[in-house]
Amino acid sequence: DDAVADGVHAISGVVDS
């Protein structure tokens, strides 16, 4: 996940990559 979206998509970020 992106560093910026990491805060918002902490969970989705893992799948979103």
Swiss-Prot record:
Presence of the UniProt keyword Transferase in the record: no
Cell compartment(s), UniProt: Secreted
Superkingdom of this protein's organism: Eukaryota
Tissue and organ distribution: Expressed in skin glands.
Keywords: Secreted
GO cellular component, one term: extracellular region
Lipid metabolism recorded as keyword: no
Reported function: May act as an antimicrobial peptide.
Family indicated by similarity: Belongs to the Frog skin active peptide (FSAP) family. Septenin subfamily.
Name under which the protein is recorded: Septenin 1h
